[in-house]
Amino acid sequence: MEQTARRIAEDLLSIRAVFFRPDEPFTWASGIKSPVYCDNRLILTAPDVRTEVETALVQTIRREYPDAEVLMGTSTAGIAHAAITAQMMGLPMGYVRSSSKDHGRQNQIEGRLEKGQKVVVVEDLISTGGSVLEVVNVLREAGAEVLGIVSIFTYGMKKGIERLAAAEVKNVSLTNFDVIAQVAAEQKYIKPEDVARLLQFRNDPSDESWIGGTH
């Protein structure tokens, strides 16, 4: 798994899907200021990396969730990855909207899902865990047995880890914030001294003392 984490980190860096701005941080929709932005949608534009990532997702699901019957993507970023992975595994696939449609059948779950089916949620990245837990809850309310989550990248934030643990849902990520920070420094995407700042952010996103200088 450590080899996979490093390889996927190298892949994401090679296609410039990870952006570093420790001195001019990004602001997420939640208001959190972050030195890193990861755009996993760019994986879809890079066929070689896309194949590597989807193959790793297949291997991870087979290893961690061998009883999986259905893959459900998160809307919107997880949909394509769920579709490709499901195709490779010969499994049914659907996705969960962030809210119900206001027309037609007003579905929040798109695709056929039977009560009791064993589901794996496919997510592109996890930060605080809020959005993916909403998906898990929707699926559970529909009667699915959620085996867990597979994600491409996790920030490894304490809040996200605690939320998933409280909801008793397992997550397995292909790579993580710490590995990407380490590889980025080795390959000179960032300065070695910036690694500590990045990890300080990951440890406590509410503490913004890492911004604007080395610590």
Each PLM stretch: what is its role?
Residues 1-122, 130-215:
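PRPP-associated nucleotide enzymes
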